[in-house]
Curated annotation (Swiss-Prot):
It is a single-pass type I membrane protein. Residues 7-127 are annotated as: Esterase domain 1. It comes from Bovine coronavirus (strain G95). This is Hemagglutinin-esterase. It catalyses: N-acetyl-9-O-acetylneuraminate + H2O = N-acetylneuraminate + acetate + H(+); N-acetyl-4-O-acetylneuraminate + H2O = N-acetylneuraminate + acetate + H(+). Residues 1-16 form the signal peptide. Disulfide bonds join 44-65, 113-162, 197-276, 205-249, 307-312, 347-371. Keywords: Disulfide bond, Glycoprotein, Hemagglutinin, Host cell membrane, Host membrane, Hydrolase, Membrane, Signal, Transmembrane, Transmembrane helix, Viral envelope protein, Virion. Belongs to the influenza type C/coronaviruses hemagglutinin-esterase family.
Amino acid sequence: MFLLPRFVLVSCIIGSLGFENPPTNVVSHLNGDWFLFGDSRSDCNHVVNTNPRNYSYMDLNPALCDSGKISSKAGNSIFRSFHFTDFYNYTGEGQQIIFYEGVNFTPYHAFKCTTSGSNDIWMQNKGLFYTQVYKNMAVYRSLTFVNVPYVYNGSAQSTALCKSGSLVLNNPAYIAREANFGDYYYKVEADFYLSGCDEYIVPLCIFNGKFLSNTKYYDDSQYYFNKDTGVIYGLNSTETITTGFDFNCHYLVLPSGNYLAISNELLLTVPTKAICLNKRKDFTPVQVVDSRWNNARQSDNMTAVACQPPYCYFRNSTTNYVGVYDINHGDAGFTSILSGLLYDSPCFSQQGVFRYNNVSSVWPLYPYGRCPTAADINTPDVPICVYDPLPLILLGILLGVAVIIIVVLLLYFMVDNGTRLHDA
């Protein structure tokens, strides 16, 4: 209690000397228990294989290349690997998770399932996917991919119905129509199995519109049934549009178990890959760095939409991405953001990373770690120190109670002494 006035005085002196400790626009970590998922901008192996080895290709400091804390692949992303044949097995584990990827599936790629489809739907899918990834990696240490085995008792094989350019969808798989069916008004099932992970992120997708085939329109209908628990997950087409729709996906977080994929109309879909989530941890917000092209290419903001507090902190540069290796690789602003991975930091917040945990000019929003509890507000004339009022209020109450007790005791002894004098 006697130290509080000294603390106030010292803090005010520090404030008067201009110590502000503002939040910095970087991603960092509390300690060495961290991991980064990325693409070419943090893919050290890709740089090693170029000639010459030009590290200006990356936004990552090359001193981190041998840290063992990076899973990155040039030309890829977690979303791209999840849905398409262009696959990289992103794998990593840490208490503090950082993502700097996503640019390799943007409106620039203009993906849509059919010629009359919609890339806007796929951007929506991307946002929903990363929302699940970020939320779950705030409570899980480990992320990797696993194959999902399935058994279909018919003779039809999976078909590459959904493709555009070099991208071919293979998760979920489409099971082609059986030869003895004259149309798509039929019910069909397949078993699939999830095992070996704590939980899984799997896709459940439908064409949300009137799907035309041979002059007939069909409403998509897909369900997953957990045979162990009896829980059913399903989607039915609700739109009446006949053009401009595409493959709408929901991303389910499922436990291990035996499942049944069911289609009541159109083609059966069944998951073939899943995000494997392992090793529950104490809640730790993930950090996401905006992943975008130079303005010459069209980007999207889906990782920003997916990254929301309290489970996620989003970091971005205020300027156009302009690389030094080429316009899309080696930007100074994003290199600065990733430079925070070179050191530990005590406090993370929505506004940025705090380098010190004593006082700050900014109150941390959605704080995590050992964060400043006071703010130093500099006016043009004199520094004014503002502190958490609770300790001062409690101190005032205690002092008030002490004063009252002292006054009561003084009155008591004065009255008692006067009475005894009178009696004498």
